[in-house]
């Protein structure tokens, strides 16, 4: 049976329209898929610890180099050339705060060497007081927190006793931090104390909301090629994060994925053992940032 010309025209136009819509729909779907696949910027930032790459840079050099290489945050490690120490006067603290702000560099934290495992109570009390001094400095210059560290287990008492001692010593530090609007970050540190299960026990022994963990990207984090078991164990307390040589074989892509998963929106801080002059340091940091961006994607 022949189809009238007007009906043939209608069917042809309808078919063309359907094909056109289908094609456009396919293009839109492909565009949406492409857009979905595009890597998004991580919620966390990249900064550096002055240990050890900038250990011999003065404050002027730090504030010149970091913005040039695209780093936004710094953790000032004690004893380094920058001179950011609890001995600073009120006026000097205000000046440092202003200079960093003017340079666009956020003072993320202060790296102390306070530790709390000594068998001598007076030594422990001294470290607590030093931590409080650093917390006051952090408050005065606008830093978020102070890094401390466990650095060993006593040999004269059971392990659990040393862990309880460290946790208990952190409580007055946390109380001081709360009063100042700052935090205490316990670095996953020490040949014995860096074991994630021991760090978890220290956090539980402390139990103060202003005391958390500074993830330290240690080889001991890795279990059967993955950091996931260690990360999940410590995730509730992670408040800061140190990262090291990105070529080391440590599963950094997995770490950054895990940080995304817990909505970590703070800072990952470069911590390298080598001391470099500003020219070579600037070059290294540029390459480091590019590789960090790729691993975060």
Segments from the language model and where they lie:
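Histidine-acidic metal/acid-base catalytic patches
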Residues: 2-47, 54-72, 193-297
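Active-site acidic/histidine proton-transfer and metal-coordination neighborhood
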Residues: 14-22, 33-40, 60-67, 97-109, ...
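Short glycine-centered, acidic/aromatic-flanked micro-motifs in structured strand/loop junctions
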Residues: 50, 78, 114, 150, ...
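A generic secondary-structure micro-motif detector
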Residues: 51-52, 85-86, 124, 163, ...
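Extended hydrophobic secondary-structure segments
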Residues: 70-82, 184
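Conserved beta-strand positions in the central sheet of alpha/beta enzyme cores
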Residues: 75, 109-111, 147, 242, ...
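Glycine-rich, proline-tolerant flexible connector loops at the mouths of alpha/beta enzymes
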Residues: 77-95, 151-156
